[in-house]
Amino acid sequence: FDCADAYSGGAAERFLGSLLKEYPRHSYVVSSKVFFPMGPGPNDGGLSRKHIVEQLDQSLINMGLDYLDLYFCHRPDPDTPIEETIRTLDDMVQAGKILYYGVSEWTPAQIAEALGVVEYYKLRPLAVIQPQYHMMDRFIEDEIMGLCERNGVGITCFSPLSQGLLTGKYRKGQPLPEGSRATHQADKQINNMLTEENLNKVEQLLEVADQLGVSLAVLALSWILRKNCVTSVITGASRPEQLEKNLAASGFVIPEDALAEIEKILDYRPNIRRIG
């Protein structure tokens, strides 16, 4: 279960905690995150030792837990040295409040610096990163994936279906589904994805999925999970049946010829600068 202190101002953690009470602690894995402001004060956000220690305690209270399996830095903090952040997270592991720690949406340079701090001070290793990754956004392939593979860092991806674009619910030339994210003007992320180019790609990907006898969502999730460095994907669902259908991706292997066809459709060009 993936959560964060900032989701609905702590209400999401409290709600999740109320549900988890029914289950033995060893039967589930739960994570939370820290960074975004939780109040108006200067120490109410960021990745300082003070905020991490205080907010982790609050997250544990919210969820009624003694420890978290995973604790993420929700974003990088330009105002706090990475050394302070990583050493604090190591202290939280030693204190038994978290088992592993990770970072989300950090740059390759920031991840590399964190790994350097771990090596220099012989700390508990950076276990995992949580970036956005899906067929339409492959930024992490340029540098981050290789960096993680070389250093034994896992990758758990959020938004693997591109805010619903890769479910096939948004079709070229068709009205937006009633009640979908794209019908809300405030949700700029999905609306920015609904370009003519992306919708054309979706139509072609739907044909590939049809030929393989799976949904576009299963195809998109399997495409991510085939990467050795990807340990899991974080999928949201508004209905239980959506989750059940998407779970089929864990056992589906995309044939090599279909992978080649997908690459042609996506037409991805790595962002590599020439030197000299």
Over which residues does each language-model region extend?
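Active-site mouth loops of central-metabolism enzymes
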Residues: 38-53, 74-80
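Beta/alpha (TIM)-barrel catalytic core signal, keyed to glycine-rich beta->alpha loops juxtaposed to Asp/Glu
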Residues: 80-266
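Short, acidic/polar
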Residues: 46-63, 111-116
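N-terminal binding-site loop/beta-alpha segment at the start of enzyme catalytic domains
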Residues: 2-28, 94
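A short, structured active-site edge motif that brings together acidic residues
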Residues: 26-39, 129-130
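Glycine-centered flexible beta-alpha turn that most often forms the glycine-rich phosphate-binding loop
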Residues: 1, 68, 101
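A short acidic, helix-capping loop that chelates divalent metal ions and anchors anionic groups
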Residues: 37-43, 166, 242
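Active-site groove signature of glycoside hydrolases
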Residues: 60-81
